[in-house]
């Protein structure tokens, strides 16, 4: 039920989807939906948690890693790509919320914590001399994770690209550059 609901939220927008639309899409009654969740917002919360829990787990793993800040940052980028590929519809939905409800605001607060962690890693890597100092750490972080997040715009579940291949491509482009040597 959750996966099919997220599919509809991504197609129509969360605010543009009614419980009646969900029931029709799922082929069940509204009361059957309410048997499982208390509201459309509760359903949204479950979906956003599916995306955020994977991203938070990736960040927690990176926090405990040994190694340089740039190595940990690269690991965070790779893990974020893997989560995005594995949970594509859920991450797509997460990237489309704007804070219109308490559920959305909670998700955005959780996402901001992840953003701050990534920006701190970028700053530490700059301070260590492993990343260029001529671009602000927060800007670098936004650009880096903007590249990761842009995958939701073109990646399809039927894609032949594996999570590992995409993680390698993003990491190479971000950390080694696009220019041939």
Feature roles, as predicted:
Residues 79, 135-153, 165-177:
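Hydrophobic alpha-helical segments that form the core
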Residues 3, 7, 45, 49, ...:
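Generic detection of well-ordered alpha-helical segments
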Residues 53-57, 86, 103-128, 137-142, ...:
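Amphipathic alpha-helical packing segments from all-alpha helical-bundle domains
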Residues 61-62, 78-85, 93-100, 173-178:
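Helix-loop "lid/cap" segments that line or gate small-molecule binding pockets
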Residues 46, 57-86, 141-144:
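Hydrophobic alpha-helical connector segments
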Residues 72, 83-103, 119, 153:
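Amphipathic alpha-helical segments used for helix-helix packing
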Residues 4-42, 46:
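Helix-turn-helix
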């Amino acid at each position: 039920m959750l996966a099919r609901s997220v599919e509809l939220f991504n197609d129509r927008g969360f605010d543009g989807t009614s419980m009646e639309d969900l029931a029709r899409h799922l082929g069940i009654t509204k009361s059957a939906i309410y048997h499982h969740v208390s509201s459309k917002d509760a359903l949204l919360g479950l979906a956003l948690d599916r995306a955020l829990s994977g991203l938070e787990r990736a960040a927690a793993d990176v926090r405990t890693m040994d190694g340089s800040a740039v190595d940990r940052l690269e690991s965070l980028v790779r893990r974020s790509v893997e989560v995005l590929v594995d949970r594509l519809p859920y991450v797509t939905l997460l990237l489309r919320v704007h804070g219109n409800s308490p559920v959305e605001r909670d998700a955005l607060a959780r996402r901001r914590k992840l953003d701050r962690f990534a920006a701190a890693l970028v700053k530490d890597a700059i301070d260590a001399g492993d990343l260029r100092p001529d671009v602000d750490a927060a800007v670098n972080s936004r650009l880096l994770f903007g590249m990761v997040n842009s995958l939701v715009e073109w990646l399809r579940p039927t894609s032949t690209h594996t999570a590992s291949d995409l993680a390698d491509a993003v990491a190479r482009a971000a950390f080694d550059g696009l220019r041939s040597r």
